[in-house]
A protein has these predicted regions:
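Short helix-boundary/capping micro-motifs
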Residues: 27-44
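The N-cap/first-turn positions of alpha helices
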Residues: 17-20, 44, 76, 83
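Residue cluster at the C-terminal edge of the helix-turn-helix DNA-binding motif
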Residues: 30, 39, 53-61
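Short, intrinsically disordered or compositionally biased N-terminal tails of bacterial proteins
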Residues: 1-16
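A short LG(V/I)-centered, amphipathic sequence patch enriched
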Residues: 55-77
Length: 104
């Protein structure tokens, strides 16, 4: 079961949507804005805006944008690892709650 795109709020005040984490991972995996956009079924402009918004929210540059490609900064590599874990934890929790609800 795929969790809906809700906002995650960190105690320091930054807000990131679950969708933003998925978009970021797609960009980092594809290594290209246009390829990630194609895979996600959104426009490159949508991904570009999202990545800039996420960088502003976190206060760190995550991506190095080059002509036709993307590279992760050190902060981006750290975020990628945490984003994968966060999405995995959300999925596991969602599945566990769904199973528990069926048993009730």
């Amino acid at each position: 079961m795929r969790p809906q795109s809700k906002i995650l709020i960190h105690e320091k005040g930054w807000k990131v949507e679950i969708r933003d984490l998925r978009y970021f991972l797609s960009m980092s995996d594809a290594g290209s804005l246009s390829e990630a956009a194609k895979n996600l079924g959104v426009t490159p402009t949508t991904l570009s805006r999202q990545s800039h918004r996420m960088e502003r929210e976190l206060g760190a540059k995550l991506l190095i944008r080059k002509r036709g490609s993307l590279e992760l900064t050190l902060a981006g590599k750290i975020m990628r690892s945490h984003a994968r874990n966060i999405l995995n934890y959300i999925s596991v929790a969602s599945d566990a709650v769904s199973r528990a609800g069926k048993d009730a």
